[in-house]
Amino acid sequence: EINYIWSSHEHPDHFSTGTLKSIDENIRSKITVLYQSTKDKKVINFCKGLGFKTQELPNKKNIMLNDDFNLICGKSGFYDSWLYLTDKYNTLLNINDCHIDTLKDLEKINKDLGNEKIDILLSQFSYAAWRGNKNDSLLREQEAKNKIRILERQLENIKPKYFIPFASYI
């Protein structure tokens, strides 16, 4: 049973209109789409138009979904967002595609979350966009090494119990 769907941002590899449309119309009204607050409300209005319940997530505000389940959604860059989930047993932080790369960025997100211990971290394990032509192997290798350095910095500073490499099979 699906109760909630969250999308980090509007790009089609994260927010799939086809997938949402493929969900049976009879159960859409039982599912709440969670999405960061935006000025244009385009995603929220689209989902409402399909018959989903919707809930906008204000930036960095704790939202209690039920007695045992909370979340915080934070904006990252111009259009992306991260998601922090807690229940009475675990904490999970999804920072996939977010530019949380520097020590300063990591200190800020730790502060935003009250320096809570993260049990599970989801983060991108490789670069996700075009990095040179076929013959630019050195550039792609440098980008991959840079992404690994960023990932190491994230793991050293967030110190999750578990890490789930996420997305980006380039």
Where are these regions (language model features)?
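Cap/insert and terminal regions of metallo-dependent hydrolase folds
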Residues: 34-35, 103-170
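Active-site environment of divalent metal-dependent phosphoester hydrolases
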Residues: 10-15, 39-43, 62-64, 78-80, ...
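Short linear motifs at secondary-structure transitions and domain/linker junctions
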Residues: 7-10, 29, 47-50, 58-62, ...
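Active-site HxH/HxHxD metal-binding segment of metal-dependent hydrolases
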Residues: 1-59
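Core dinuclear metal-dependent hydrolase active-site scaffold
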Residues: 1, 56-128
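Short amphipathic alpha-helical segments and helix-helix/interface helices
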Residues: 17-25, 43-44, 82, 106-111, ...
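Glycine-centered loop/turn positions within well-structured domains
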Residues: 13, 90, 161
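Low-complexity, flexible helical/coil segments
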Residues: 2-5, 40-47, 66-73, 129-134, ...
